[in-house]
């Protein structure tokens, strides 16, 4: 029973020590600075590339074009000339 009672505090101690070592290593190598710069350039901040494949939708001129280009059908947004897939 003594072994079971010591396992949890020992595990927590090891996790705290290793996480602190990882933080120190990131500071020493400068990786922490790169991570901050990468977060500032993420799509969350409104930077949207028109050539990004995740933001692409098929172009169209009428609804029938979207019927064939979307898996479950869709309709054509005439203003943007893009398919709105369902």
UniProtKB/Swiss-Prot annotation:
Signal peptide from the UniProt entry: 1-25
Biological process terms in GO annotation: defense response to fungus; killing of cells of another organism
Disulfide bonds: 60-76, 66-83, 70-85
Keywords for the protein's UniProt record, in alphabetical order: Antimicrobial, Disulfide bond, Fungicide, Plant defense, Secreted, Signal
Subcellular location: Secreted
Chief location category: secreted
Taxonomic superkingdom: Eukaryota
Membrane-spanning intervals of the chain: none
GO cellular component, one term: extracellular region
Sequence similarity: Belongs to the DEFL family.
Protein name: Defensin-like protein 259
Organism: Arabidopsis thaliana
Lineage start: Eukaryota, Viridiplantae, Streptophyta, Embryophyta, Tracheophyta
